[in-house]
Amino acid sequence: MFIPRPSHAIDFFYENAPYLRNEQEGIRVSPLVKDEPLVNTIEGVKIVYDIFRNTVRRQPNDPFIGWHDTLSAPYEWMTYDEVNEKVEACGSGLLQFEELTENSSKCVGLYATNCPGWLIAELGCWAYGLVVVPLYDTLGQEALKHICNEAELSVIVCDTPERAKKLIDERRSMPHLKHIVVLFSKEELEDLRSAAGSDVGMITFNELLARGNANRQKPCPLDEDGLVTICYTSGTTGTPKGAMICNRNLIAIIAGTQRVLGKFITKEDTILSFLPLAHIYEQYCEIYLMYVGARIGFYSGNITTVSEDLRMLRPTIFTSVPRLLCRIYDNVYERICKSTFKQFLLKFALKEKCHQVDKQIYNKSFWDSMIFSKILRNFGGRVRLVLVTGAPIAPPVLRFTRAVFSCPVLEGYGCTETCGPVSSSLAGDLKGSHVGAPWPSVEIKLTDVPDMDLVASRDNRGEICVRGDSCISGYYKNPEKTAKLIDEDGWLHTGDVGTWHEGCLKVVDRCKNIFKLAQGEYIAPEKLELVYQQSALINQIFVDGDAHSTFPVALVVPEVEPLLKALSNHSPKSPRESIVAPQSKPSLEDICADPIAKKIVMAELKSLSEAANFMGFEKVKNIKLISEPFSIDNSMLTPTQKVARPAVRKRYAEELVNLYKEHPVAQ
């Protein structure tokens, strides 16, 4: 059913200035709760499985899960009742594996891209007291093995022969793994069965369902404090940490969401599932859509053809990350950059639409038909709400998105450890560059960060700390990291530095030397620097990145003699390509200005990153050679000989900005 675009102001423009509940400690809450208790319960719902079960009882014949086998094919749908049949068959089938009933670990790995089988397997686990452990490729092979061993995964559901082969190849180093359930055809399974031998049993998902149907059992979910998911972080600080998410956490975040969006999102809505289900954000979104009884259509599995999925599904709610919205923005401006008239027309149309949007009026206009219709068609033409998370979104991109889609764009902030939003802008927030007020399920305060000389009460800046039922209790089998995450008063320390800007929360930094890229991936620069410093060409290196860029960059202080030798062995294509003559004795400044020297060092970084099996997003894509070494005297090194990152970032701010502006250096 089509949900018409409103031609008047949306009805969820709540006051969004945080309410200061405790002035002495600086504790702020949502203006929706003020002095009332936090919103963390739902009437008639105790656990996540209740959400699904209640919707099945309320609207059994309504469509729930959709998919299409080819890009040109229309979506096919399973009803809530049909999905429930498969969920109970799946859960009953999983209980036929004795490892899940006799061993202490009740964890099941899900190693797949978003698909109906992923959601059915997850619900099947929750219905029968099993714990879901998502796995994903960007973790890297070593991290994958660590998770499988720490969670003692005896059963893993995976979606492709390639992923199944990865597991089989590593089976000797993952002794708990006994069964792989595959979401592909039986014909593709035979070669893998031969490779697995007797070590690992392999069956198809349909065979699992058949076993469950033959041995159907009554659902037996865990209680409110029962563990439902262990979501591992991407391991940027070393070994991945498993966030323990229980029923109580997810119910609290859904309760808070219902308080904010309950009058706007309905059972008539449709969402495209393409952001990774291995991350908590997409799981949270789909649980809430399940709560209201809406539809979830899965993408075809290829991120490059998501636009085809969108056109065919025609979703009403679009979940995104800033990088994708920036790509839309860049593509539009790239297409019109050669035409002065088109640039003028677009700017004028955006100005006119923004006048309407600023008044919270989201109706179709002349400019939609004339200018924005082609963009809207790429998204199916029905989007009426855009939800963005993962990294900050630039204000021009935010205004552009609001105008083009002619709908509210809500920018949220949260992390795995908070199971979803900590705060969010609302439809009436027009300025951007902030993430709104606290979610109704949490309290927020800023605390001092001594290492950064930040005093929250003095600077209106400090570490963002969160407290509420939606916050996890700790990391799986990791009491040391848990103690660092949650203090004695129950405050969860996010590691992000924030400030209250015009009444709204703004994320401005990281407490530790970790940063997030535009696509939402975290980077630990010291990990990269440790590898790159193995090069004889490098004396010192400083790796940096920010949330508006998709790649890290670096400042490099070169080793003079090895780099001179490399230059002398280099044969430029033309005498003028290198500004350093091989026979001369150039200064370090001359070497750093030489484009050939830069190419040589970049090639070295590429070689080292490949040897270390860096992920694509971890590889430095642009560098600047600098002649002044980092030292204690110039404040670029700490007394313990560590790089003073804030000082280096401040000293080379202009150079770093230029590295992001330049195209990544070809490698």
Which role does the model predict for each range below?
Residues F2-L20, A127-A210, I600-M602:
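Structural core segment of the AMP-binding/adenylate-forming
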Residues P63, V182, M202-I203, A210-Y232, ...:
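Conserved pre-ATP/AMP-binding loop-to-beta segment of ANL
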Residues S72-Y80, G91-L139:
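Conserved AMP-binding/adenylate-forming
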Residues W77-D81, V228-I254:
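Conserved AMP-binding A3 loop
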Residues N84, E88-A89, A210, A243-F264, ...:
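Conserved structural elements of the adenylate-forming
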Residues L139-E170, I253-L272, E286, N302-I317:
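Conserved ATP-dependent adenylate/AMP-binding module captured primarily in the ANL superfamily
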Residues V200-I203, T316-T319, I328-L430, E443:
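Gly/Ser/Thr-rich phosphate-binding loop
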Residues M452-L517:
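Conserved ATP-binding/catalytic segment of the ANL
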